[in-house]
């Protein structure tokens, strides 16, 4: 059962709330090809205490990923993107890393797409709990990262659900814009 329910007739999306269903706005990544399936991802904006992680520049400096800090990175906020569905831990971390570093722009749509929307099976709270591990996975030299974040914490500020388009093939799901494939098994 999906944690986000969609209605193709009225083009709305809902998730459970304390007093019933709450209307939400799903976002969709554009695609050059007609997708056969959309996989859901949580876009998680957070604030850090004990270390700096608000912008792209903060991420590059904190994790020491091999990128040059460019002027736009100083003012562009960084958010984590993690799968909103349960998968093997290795694949979860690989997808989280790939999508968090790629940072494609998702858009609101007036109508829900006709392609299948994969169910959201990972609650946002569980996705948020994974962020310290995802942050560690992003760092090429984890032993240098851990002293920087020791005693620090991440707090959620804003979350939203975003759907990434894929082409379904017999053995895998392909995301052409990111040149990425996910094995079905």
Q: Which residue ranges define each predicted feature?
A:
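Long C-terminal interaction/binding lobes of large macromolecular proteins
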Residues: 2-185
